[in-house]
Amino acid sequence: TTALHLTLVALGIKEGDEVIVPDITFAATINAVLYCQATPVICEINSKTWCIDIDSINELISPRTKAIIPVHLYGIPCEMEKLIHIAKDKDIFVIEDCAEAIGSKIDKKRVGTYGDCSTFSFYGNKTITTGEGGMALFNCEKIYDKAKLLRDHGMSKNKRYWHDVVGFNYRMTNLQAAVGVAQMERFDQIIKSKQTIFDFYNKKFMGKKGILQLPINSPNITNSSWLYTLILDKYINRDSLINKLKDSGIDSRPSFNSLCNMPPYKGFTHSKVLKNSQLLSSQ
């Protein structure tokens, strides 16, 4: 969350600006925009990938649009090449939200390397964890320097206890960093282990009655296998299944709720009904 906020501030996002976000994501994505007093514009999702729907973006772009935040949901990469083409044509920043997708790739190119900035989460349930905290990447040294200044109270690196701007206390502790670095040393092994589990689930669930969709599988993408996802037929009660799994010691959870259905975020969509995100939330 702080990484998203920091990148937005470093890019100069402010009151009066608009930032396009997908309707299905953890609330941190839209909250970071609101922290900047900017206006989030909620976008429909793709029915297959559950990521931001590229075909819906153009109609949401206005003269006030300054950034798009694609979220690689549950480790599934967005259609980044198409999105980058739109953003470059309109001179709009792209901030990749890779909170759930460290290790995911498109044609062997890692997510987080397409946009102007990208953010990663090291929360306790993530593939790499430091308990809390995250990471931000930048492809512009000037923006990187600004973010580095802002994360440490805006304190000048040339004059001790001199503050050129109002900054934040967004520093990761050395202990947290050490925990994260130790995991990065066996990163490939961690991903491989998770993908083995995914393959096991795929074999067990493939063709089973009541399961409409397994995690998307495409030759040109690598899913980092963060969370295994299922779409259930409407005759299966999702919440009852979650409770039955819990009784068996198996943790499961519903998908994220549609942002535009929740009180703090109503009014940030240009459409009355976002059919794909509404359907996913209910399944």
Feature annotation, model-predicted:
Residues D55, A67-V71, I76, M80-K82, ...:
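PLP-dependent aminotransferase class I/II
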Residues I24, A38, I45, A99-E100, ...:
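Histidine-centered beta-alpha loop that forms part of the nucleotide-sugar donor binding/catalytic region
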Residues L4-L8:
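Short, conserved alpha-helix that lines the donor NDP-sugar binding/gating region
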Residues T1, A27, C51, P77, ...:
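Glycine-rich phosphate-binding loop at the start of an alpha helix
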Residues E96-T130, K159-D164:
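Conserved active-site segment immediately N-terminal to the catalytic lysine
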Residues V9-C98, K105:
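PLP-dependent aminotransferase-like
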Residues T113-M155, N174:
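Active-site PLP attachment segment
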